[in-house]
C-alpha cells in the first residue's frame, strides 16, 4: 500500500469507529458508513472492476477478498454505489458474489477437492435466546422450517459437551448466541452457551471434524475487528471458524438487528436447499445464497445500510 492509500484506509476506519460511538442505529453512523462505502469504491472498487474488464472476468463471478491490516475492518464486499452500463444504485455485491478469506492458505484448504457429498446435509441448530437476542427463537423456527433435517439444542440442552457430540454427526451448524473474541488469542474465542458455559474454538479444533462444511454464526460481532484487534490480521471469530475446518462460514460485522435474523435465515436456507443447484455441493451454494438473501433484505422499505452491510461470507 502507498502512503496515501494507507492514510485513506486509516481515515475510513477511524470515521467508522468514531461514528459507532453514537450507536449503530444513529444517523451519524449511517452517514459515515455511506461515505466509507463510496470511498472504498473510489479507492479500491473502481480500479479492481476496471481490471476485471481487462481480464474478461464476467459479472456474477465469485470474488474473494484477502485483506490485511486496516483493510480487515472495512466492508469491501459492499462498496458503492456503482454506476455501470447506465445502471445506477448498484453495489459491488450486485455485480459479483463476494467472499473473504483470512489467508490464501485457508481458502486453498477450503476449496481443496475432497469426497463430494451431494446428499442433503443435516443441520445442527444451537440457540441460546436471552433478553439481548429475543429473535433467536423465531430464527430457530425459520431454520427448522427451511432445512430438510435439523437437530436442535436450545436452552439447557445447549451445553459445550452436547454441542461437541452432535457436531461430529452434522455437516452444517447454525449458532444463534453470543460470540466473544479474545484479542491476541483467537482460538480462545468462544460461544456463550447454557448458564454462561463456553464453547471455544480450541475445543472445535481438537475435536477434528472431517465432515464439517458450513457454519452460520448468527452471534454478535462474529466478524468485527476493532482498533485493538487490527494487529491480529483479520483472524476474528468468523475467520477462525474457517480455520477449524469448516469450508464456508457466514458471520456478521457487528450486532445484528433482531428483526433481520429470521428473514435473512429463511431466505438463505430456502436458496441453499433449492432444486436449481444440480451437481453443486451444498457448502458451495452458501456465498450466492447469502448474497441473494442480503439483496432481498436491502429491498425492504427504509432499510438502513448498517443492517444489510453487516453480513459477510468466508471460505469456499
Regions found by a protein language model. Give the residues of each.
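Short helix-loop-beta junction
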Residues: 138-151, 240-247
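Structural motif
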Residues: 66-70, 127-131, 155-157, 177-178
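Short acidic loop-to-helix transition motifs that present clustered carboxylates
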Residues: 153-162, 197-200
Amino acid at each position: 500500500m502507498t502512503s496515501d492509500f494507507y492514510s485513506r484506509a486509516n481515515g475510513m476506519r477511524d470515521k467508522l469507529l468514531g461514528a459507532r460511538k453514537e450507536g449503530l442505529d444513529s444517523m451519524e453512523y449511517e452517514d459515515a458508513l455511506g461515505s466509507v462505502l463510496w470511498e472504498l469504491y473510489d479507492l479500491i472498487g473502481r480500479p479492481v472492476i476496471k481490471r476485471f474488464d481487462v481480464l474478461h472476468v464476467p459479472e456474477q463471478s465469485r470474488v474473494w477478498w484477502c485483506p490485511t491490516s486496516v483493510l480487515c475492518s472495512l466492508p469491501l464486499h459492499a462498496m458503492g454505489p456503482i454506476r455501470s452500463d447506465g445502471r445506477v444504485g448498484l453495489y459491488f455485491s450486485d455485480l459479483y458474489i463476494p467472499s473473504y478469506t483470512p489467508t490464501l492458505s485457508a481458502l486453498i484448504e477450503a476449496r481443496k477437492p475432497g469426497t463430494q457429498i451431494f446428499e442433503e446435509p443435516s443441520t445442527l441448530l444451537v440457540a441460546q435466546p436471552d433478553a439481548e437476542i429475543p429473535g433467536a427463537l423465531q430464527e430457530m423456527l425459520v431454520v427448522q422450517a427451511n432445512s430438510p433435517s435439523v437437530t436442535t439444542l436450545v436452552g439447557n440442552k445447549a451445553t459445550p459437551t452436547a454441542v461437541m457430540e452432535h457436531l461430529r454427526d452434522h455437516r452444517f451448524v447454525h449458532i444463534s448466541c453470543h460470540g466473544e473474541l479474545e484479542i491476541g488469542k483467537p482460538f480462545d474465542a468462544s460461544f456463550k452457551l447454557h448458564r454462561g458455559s463456553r464453547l471455544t474454538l480450541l475445543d472445535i479444533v481438537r475435536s477434528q471434524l472431517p465432515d464439517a462444511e458450513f457454519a452460520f454464526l448468527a452471534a454478535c460481532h462474529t466478524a468485527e475487528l476493532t482498533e485493538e484487534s487490527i494487529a491480529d490480521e483479520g483472524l476474528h471469530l468468523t475467520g477462525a471458524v474457517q480455520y477449524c475446518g469448516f469450508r464456508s462460514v457466514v458471520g456478521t460485522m457487528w450486532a445484528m438487528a433482531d428483526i433481520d435474523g429470521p428473514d435473512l435465515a429463511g431466505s438463505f436456507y430456502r436458496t441453499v436447499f433449492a432444486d436449481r443447484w444440480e451437481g453443486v455441493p451444498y457448502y458451495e451454494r452458501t456465498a450466492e445464497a447469502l448474497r441473494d438473501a442480503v439483496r432481498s433484505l436491502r429491498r425492504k422499505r427504509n432499510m438502513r445500510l448498517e443492517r444489510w452491510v453487516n453480513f459477510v461470507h468466508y471460505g469456499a
